[in-house]
A protein has these predicted regions:
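Solvent-exposed strand-loop boundary residues in beta-sheet-rich modules
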Residues: 66, 119-121, 138
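Hydrophobic pocket/interface hotspot
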Residues: 40, 52-53, 60, 72, ...
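Short, low-complexity N-terminal intrinsically disordered segments enriched in polar/charged residues
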Residues: 4, 13-58
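Bacterial N-terminal signal peptides that target proteins for export
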Residues: 1-7
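Surface-exposed, charged secondary-structure patches
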Residues: 77-123
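Short beta-strand edge/turn micro-motifs at domain boundaries
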Residues: 21, 127-149
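A mature extracytoplasmic/lumenal domain signature
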Residues: 56, 66, 111-113, 147
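Short solvent-exposed beta->alpha transition segments
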Residues: 56-88
Length: 149
């Protein structure tokens, strides 16, 4: 009886000490999410639609702050490629405020993006929240849903 109790206690201790599947999913997704955020801040300034759409899954969905919906990586690329030449992004930053793993292959990320835009002589600073669903697709983590508020 005592041996069984010790064995059960040891099993519980080892289970608690090991990383949970949630932590494994978050750790696995982190390099992709961090890279995409870093590249977004640079590419939104330079206006590079290929870099901006790169993390999206082929049928990923982007919902803009105005409620517009773009379905597919090509449509997301087209949004970024359509920025008028008269609009310049002077500065951009993105901050991930949190991440959660609802299952081993999905990670929800939320945060804040800040941007400084020049239209003609007018310069405007804005910030907005975002919620992104990342999905583990084979060897990659890709965006399947992205909502900009």
């Amino acid at each position: 009886m005592r041996a069984r109790l010790m064995l059960t206690s040891a099993a519980l201790l080892l289970t608690a000490a090991g990383p949970s599947w949630q932590q494994r999913a978050l750790s696995s997704a982190a390099p992709s999410t961090d890279k995409a955020n870093h590249e977004w801040a640079r590419a939104i300034v330079s206006g590079d639609p290929d870099v901006l759409s790169a993390p999206y899954e082929e049928h990923g969905i982007f919902i803009g702050p105005d409620g517009s919906v773009s379905v597919g990586k090509a449509a997301v690329r087209a949004i970024y490629a359509s920025r008028p030449a008269s609009v310049r992004v002077l500065k951009a930053d993105i901050r991930s405020d949190g991440r959660a793993a609802p299952d081993p292959d999905d990670v929800y990320e939320w945060g804040t993006a800040e941007i400084t835009v020049q239209r003609g002589a007018a310069i405007k600073e804005a910030s907005g929240r975002y919620l992104t669903v990342w999905h583990h697709n084979g060897a990659r983590w890709v965006i399947t849903r992205n909502i900009a508020f």
